[in-house]
Amino acid sequence: METALLLAKLPEAYQIFDPLVDVLPLIPLFFLLLAFVWQASVGFK
């Protein structure tokens, strides 16, 4: 249990990457949106 809590919190050295880790799960949504916009631009062929 303690190991999981230790791994869940980023070490101090990686604290600067904390905002990046918050954004990473959103990247697949951006790809989905990009695919939709691309299909809309070519007319859903």
Swiss-Prot record:
* GO biological process annotation, one example: photosynthesis
- What is one cellular component GO term in this UniProt entry? plasma membrane-derived thylakoid membrane
What gene does this protein come from? psbK
What's its job? One of the components of the core complex of photosystem II (PSII). PSII is a light-driven water:plastoquinone oxidoreductase that uses light energy to abstract electrons from H(2)O, generating O(2) and a proton gradient subsequently used for ATP formation. It consists of a core antenna complex that captures photons, and an electron transfer chain that converts photonic excitation into a charge separation.
Tell me which UniProt keywords the record has, alphabetically. Answer: Membrane, Photosynthesis, Photosystem II, Reaction center, Thylakoid, Transmembrane, Transmembrane helix
Q: Where in the cell is it found?
A: Cellular thylakoid membrane
Tell me, in one coarse class, where this protein mainly resides: membrane
Name the InterPro entries for this protein.
PSII_PsbK, PSII_PsbK_sf
The answer, when asked if Glycosyltransferase is one of the entry's keywords, is no
Q: What family is this?
A: Belongs to the PsbK family.
Membrane topology category = Single-pass membrane protein
Propeptide, residue positions? 1-8
Q: How does it assemble?
A: PSII is composed of 1 copy each of membrane proteins PsbA, PsbB, PsbC, PsbD, PsbE, PsbF, PsbH, PsbI, PsbJ, PsbK, PsbL, PsbM, PsbT, PsbX, PsbY, PsbZ, Psb30/Ycf12, peripheral proteins PsbO, CyanoQ (PsbQ), PsbU, PsbV and a large number of cofactors. It forms dimeric complexes.
Task: Answer yes or no on keyword Transcription regulation.
Answer: no
Give one Pfam hit by family name: PsbK
Q: Where are the transmembrane segments?
A: 24-44
What name has this protein been given in UniProt?
Photosystem II reaction center protein K
- What organism is the protein native to? Microcystis aeruginosa (strain NIES-843 / IAM M-2473)
